[in-house]
Structure formats: C-alpha cells, structure tokens
C-alpha cells in the first residue's frame, strides 16, 4: 500500500518527460504530418477500390 502513491506519481510524470524525438530536424527528415497524410490518402484509395466492382463502375476512381 505504501508504494501505490509513488506508483501513481510516476505514472503522472511519464507523459511530461521530454521526448527522445525532441531533436532539431535535418534536411532529410520528413514531418510526421506528411507521413500521416500519405497513410490517410493510401487508406482512402484502398477503401474506394474495395467496394469497386464492374456492376458499380461509377464508384471506381482510377
């Protein structure tokens, strides 16, 4: 029981710790937002093609 408050305090401190990613960007780094947008676009294309069939050609976006 004595360790419970210490454990809770440690759990609260973990998210506020400095991140390892907090380093200056170099010219070769890609922003995470760009990677997120690319993944979102790829998933959207996959979703559109998943429901595509010859009977529903109007839904296909090639």
UniProtKB/Swiss-Prot annotation:
Signal peptide feature range: 1-22
Pfam families: Chi-conotoxin (PF16981)
Segments traversing the membrane: none
Entry PTM: Contains 2 disulfide bonds that can be either 'C1-C3, C2-C4' or 'C1-C4, C2-C3', since these disulfide connectivities have been observed for conotoxins with cysteine framework V (for examples, see AC P0DQQ7 and AC P81755).
Propeptide: 23-48
Subcellular location: Secreted
Keywords for this protein: Cleavage on pair of basic residues, Disulfide bond, Secreted, Signal, Toxin
Tissue-by-tissue expression: Expressed by the venom duct.
Top-level taxonomic group: Eukaryota
Family listed: Belongs to the conotoxin T superfamily.
Protein name: Conotoxin Lt5.3
Species of provenance: Conus litteratus
């Amino acid at each position: 029981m004595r360790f419970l408050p210490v454990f809770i305090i440690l759990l609260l401190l973990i998210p506020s710790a400095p991140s390892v990613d907090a380093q200056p960007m170099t010219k070769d780094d890609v922003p995470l937002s760009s990677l997120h947008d690319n993944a979102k676009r790829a998933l959207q294309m996959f979703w559109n093609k998943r429901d595509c069939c010859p009977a529903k050609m109007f839904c296909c976006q090639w």
